[in-house]
Amino acid sequence: MAVDANKMTSSNGCGYVDGTPRLFIRIESAAVALAAMIAYRQLGEPWWLFAALFLAPDLSMIGYLAGPRVGALLYNVVHVYAGPAILVGFGFLSGSVIAQALASIWFAHIGFDRMLGYGLKYGQGFAFTHLGRLGFRANRQSASP
C-alpha cells in the first residue's frame, strides 16, 4: 500500500495528522473538554473561576515574542495533557479541590483548542501545528491536488 507523502507533510516539511485520524482527534478532544467541564461541575467550584482561567494557558503565547522556536516550546509545554494530569494527581493525593478544579479547567482548555484544530506547534511559526496549518487559506491550499 503506497503512502501519499503530500498527505503526511506540509509544504515546509512538518508532519501533521490528516483525514480520519484528524477528525478522531478533534472528536476525542471535544470529549475531553466535556468530561473536564463535568468534573469541574462535580467539584462545586464557581463558574466565574472557570471562565476567568479558561484562556490562561494561552498566556504561553507570549513566548513568541522571543521567536517562533521559543514560542512553540513554551506553548507546547502548556498545551500537552501531562501538565493537568500531574496537577489532578496531586489534587487527588493531597485532597486539594482547587488543584483538581484548576486541572479540570486546564484539561478543558486543551481539549477545546484541539477540538477547534489548534494543535501542538512546530518551530517554524504559530500556524504550523501537528493538526495541520492554521488559517482558511492554508487549509484550502493543502486540500487542493
Please place each PLM-identified region on the residue numbering:
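N-terminal membrane-targeting hydrophobic helices
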Residues: A2-P145
